[in-house]
């Protein structure tokens, strides 16, 4: 549709300059190689095709996480959110997980959502760790605000990382009181939780860049239902 670019200049929020996230490869528990790379805006329509069926799965609050993630990615695609980014995990080209967040300012980051489309392999945990790696090591932020919407998210983020509770502080997503990750906490947790190798072998990177393959909806539902791994 045609755009009134003069009006768009008013409607589009400020965007901070963000260095790219360098891709890496993670060996999953089943021996498969997951390429973690940064999405570009043009990837959003393909990513949304994987997120959409998850919106109707109640297990572990997949419905609310997926619905919010869908809206956040669409807002990024339509230039309606400030300084958002998205990282994704691919196995043999298939999209198996998505994480996103944004910069509140140059010092403070907002963690948005973590969605594992293939369960039982710690894909969500690996992608969350990659997201924190991006905020702390590459964006050089002083803190990342995090809130959980599910019990498993609380265990994976707040407990595993020993996050600091921020009494009286409301995360952008609403919900419970926000927690934060600081560089000190990140580097303390990094040896246990942040994994992956760089550079990605050329054949694996080429396969990931070639296409974002979306699994059929019934297969996505089966994966989230607890059947291990692609």
How would you name each of these model-derived features?
Residues 47-55, 131, 135:
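Hydrophobic alpha-helical core bundles mediating ligand binding, dimerization, or RNAP-core interactions
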Residues 87-89, 133-136, 154, 173-176:
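Catalytic cores of nucleotide-enabled group-transfer and carboxylate-activating enzymes in metabolic
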Residues 121-136:
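Conserved acetyl-CoA-binding loop-helix of GNAT-fold acetyltransferases
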Residues 144-159:
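Conserved beta-strand-loop-alpha-helix junction that forms the acyl-donor binding cleft
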């Amino acid at each position: 549709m045609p755009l009134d670019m003069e009006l768009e200049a008013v409607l589009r929020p400020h965007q901070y300059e963000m260095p790219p996230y360098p891709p890496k490869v993670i060996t999953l528990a089943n021996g498969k190689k997951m390429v973690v790379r940064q999405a570009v805006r043009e990837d959003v329509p393909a990513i949304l095709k994987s997120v959409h069926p998850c919106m109707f799965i109640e297990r572990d609050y997949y419905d609310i996480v997926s619905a919010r993630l869908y809206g956040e990615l669409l807002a990024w695609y339509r230039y309606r959110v400030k300084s958002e980014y998205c990282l994704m995990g691919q196995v043999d080209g298939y999209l198996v997980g998505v994480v996103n967040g944004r910069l509140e300012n140059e010092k403070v980051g907002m963690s948005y959502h973590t969605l594992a489309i293939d369960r039982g392999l710690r894909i969500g945990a690996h992608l969350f760790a990659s997201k924190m790696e991006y905020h702390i090591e590459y964006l050089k932020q002083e803190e990342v605000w995090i809130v959980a919407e599910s019990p498993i998210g609380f265990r994976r983020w707040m407990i595993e990382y020993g996050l600091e509770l921020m009494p009286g502080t409301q995360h952008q997503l609403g919900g419970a009181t926000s927690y934060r990750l600081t560089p000190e906490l990140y580097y303390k947790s990094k040896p246990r939780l942040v994994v992956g190798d760089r550079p990605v072998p050329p054949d694996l990177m080429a396969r990931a860049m070639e296409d974002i393959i979306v699994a059929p909806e019934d297969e996505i539902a089966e994966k989230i239902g607890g059947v291990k791994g692609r």
